[in-house]
């Protein structure tokens, strides 16, 4: 039996649901066709694990401070946040559950926005001592 690839915890926990979500989003209007309703925009989902090495999870206050200082200034037009629960299987066979936060951003797909998103990811990893922040990009038809 092959050993699993050394992926980060959050990647393992969310791979299948994210692939399914990505496939559904792409089939909605990501095939190069014009949107029947609304306009095509880029959609980025960011998955932030809340567990830390010292067993003290990222608090709601710390999370909101991060959003207020790192995310909102870069995406002033708005964003969506929600709580999520993931799980992943460690190499030793132990099933681990982890609470997380998800941010959904709609944007124009510019290099500047992509860099802003990568900066947000790096700031979170640095501030909260995380291995990774999962990023999923797709296109969606958006109407307000």
Question: Predicted segment positions?
Answer:
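Classic N-terminal secretory signal peptides
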Residues: 17-23
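Bacterial N-terminal signal peptides that target proteins for export
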Residues: 2-16
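Mature extracytoplasmic domains of secretory-pathway proteins
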Residues: 62-100, 105-112
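C-terminal motif of bacterial Sec signal peptides marking the signal peptidase cleavage site
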Residues: 24-28
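Bacterial signal peptide processing site
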Residues: 30-32
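Helix-rich interaction surfaces within compact, conserved domain-sized segments
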Residues: 95-144
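Short glycine/proline-enriched loop/turn "hinge" motifs that connect secondary-structure elements
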Residues: 35-39, 94-96
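Terminal, regulation- and interaction-focused segments at domain boundaries
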Residues: 41-60
């Amino acid at each position: 039996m092959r050993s699993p690839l050394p992926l980060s915890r959050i990647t393992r926990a969310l791979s299948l649901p994210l692939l399914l979500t990505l496939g559904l989003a792409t089939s909605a209007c990501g095939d190069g066709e014009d949107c029947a309703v609304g306009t095509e925009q880029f959609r980025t989902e960011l998955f932030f694990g809340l567990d830390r090495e010292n067993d003290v999870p990222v608090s709601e206050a710390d999370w909101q401070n991060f959003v207020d200082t790192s995310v909102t200034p870069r995406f002033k037009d708005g964003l969506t946040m929600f709580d999520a629960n993931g799980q992943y299987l460690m190499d030793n066979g132990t099933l681990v559950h982890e609470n997380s936060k998800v941010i959904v951003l709609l944007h124009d797909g510019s290099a500047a926005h992509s860099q802003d998103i990568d900066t947000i990811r790096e700031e979170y990893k640095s501030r909260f001592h995380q291995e990774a922040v999962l990023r999923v990009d797709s296109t969606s038809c958006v109407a307000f």
